[in-house]
């Protein structure tokens, strides 16, 4: 069986989709799984052994461009037996429809009745995103109940020689850590500061860990450079040499390798958090949640500890009450609490 997946457009969602690919291989061992996704996803898909081929989706997130979708779909005709559409948007279902793939499966989303012929409507029965993904591996009449759904955690393959090569590219920066074990911080998050643990808490945590003999490596995209530098500059001058700001200086592939080299990770609810959770050699991970809900998109790792001080589901907010836009529930998570959780994880 040849299967086309229309993949998600976010790092964390792409990582979690690996659970679906594993389940498809369990059910159809000889299947060929191709994933259409944005080009930046290739480094992640290359680390998922179940994926046969990554197909670049040239249309940007949010763009409609119907005729281009038609041409892409037409180019894929007579190649696939099954299509699974992971995004909920109406437009994401066009390419399998135009490709005339016989079986087109996905959740109802934006009322895609005319485009998908295996439309699932009971999404609320599966509260976790990874459950919704894995449920699509099954025929409509054979989907297990949520508690019985087999969930294989995502795992991104890493190789010691590739990690060493990546470290060599950043050797000049990393030598400043004087061979101290690294703790990685992922201080960024999409959709504004309400999802971020305050930079001054990260700085205090870094001071404590540096005193304990660790070094700190800050990861993130170019958008996270300023917040990461605020953390570094928040340290005492003699401690700054042990805090390396790599935000915006790595590509996604390099970030995976360098995160894999860390002794542990502290992260906001972000794509990098899901990457840290999904390494094939799991790392101790402290995941910090505020208004977003770990009951929907938790880090899928037995080495992860979640800290969240409020109950309930998602709170739709992009800016918190504090001056910097931080959410009070994240402000209330103290560095000492994070140190306590890290100590327990590192002792295991």
UniProtKB/Swiss-Prot annotation:
A Pfam cross-reference name: Glyco_transf_9
Keyword DNA damage: no
Pathway: Bacterial outer membrane biogenesis; LOS core biosynthesis
Keyword annotations of the record: Glycosyltransferase, Transferase
Recorded catalytic activity of this chain's protein: an L-alpha-D-Hep-(1->5)-[alpha-Kdo-(2->4)]-alpha-Kdo-(2->6)-lipid A + ADP-L-glycero-beta-D-manno-heptose = an L-alpha-D-Hep-(1->3)-L-alpha-D-Hep-(1->5)-[alpha-Kdo-(2->4)]-alpha-Kdo-(2->6)-lipid A + ADP + H(+)
Signal peptide residues on this chain, from the entry's feature table: none
GO BP: lipopolysaccharide core region biosynthetic process
GO function term, MF aspect, one: ADP-heptose-lipopolysaccharide heptosyltransferase activity
InterPro entries: Glyco_trans_9 (IPR002201), LPS_LOS_Heptosyltrfase (IPR051199), RfaF (IPR011910)
Disruption phenotype: Mutant synthesizes a truncated LOS molecule and becomes attenuated in an animal model for experimental chancroid.
Gene Ontology CC terms: cytosol
Misc. remarks from the entry: Can complement a S.typhimurium mutant lacking waaF.
Function comment: Glycosyltransferase involved in the biosynthesis of the core oligosaccharide region of lipooligosaccharide (LOS). Catalyzes the addition of a heptose unit to the heptosyl-Kdo2-lipid A module.
PANTHER family the record matches: ADP-HEPTOSE--LPS HEPTOSYLTRANSFERASE 2, TETRAACYLDISACCHARIDE 4'-KINASE-RELATED
Protein name per the record: Lipooligosaccharide heptosyltransferase 2
Protein source organism: Haemophilus ducreyi (strain 35000HP / ATCC 700724)
Gene name linked to the record: waaF
